[in-house]
Amino acid sequence: MTRIQREEPLVVSLLDRLLDDEPGVSTEAAKGRVQVLRELKQSVRRDLEILLNTRTRCLAWPPGLKELKQSLVNYGLPDFTGADLGSAKSREQFCGIVQAVIRQHEPRFKSVRVQLLGGAEPLDRTLRFRIDALLRAEPAPEPVVFDSVLKPATGAFEVKGGADE
């Protein structure tokens, strides 16, 4: 006898459920799977941008406090303000750091890969990279792609994509 698989409903994060996009409306219509998935991707994009624009402390933790390295106290990227991202090797290392930080702090991803994208012009110092990930969703993981930019003048990251445009 075959077992009927019941599809688990997709649910956005608790924070997104508590935020009210339309405070003047007292009731909300039920959302379909496609709309919930789109909202989930948008919230992941927003949270990725926050993660990449957050800096961790510069100093190493005392040797006896190893757990802090894996905790939320260590949320964000190391400060790279003085880093030379001009060489291909340093850019690849930077992408590796970004990938490791996303893996550590974004549990909604099943897998993550960060790859460097070429610049539009030879003198353009903007660092462009793509985040390919599998978003945990039922019944099957959903592939998402985020095109990201590090603006050298401000040190700010901009993350685009993820949702069906």
Which residue ranges define each predicted feature?
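Mid-length scaffold segments of soluble, non-membrane domains
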Residues: G82-H105, F109-S111
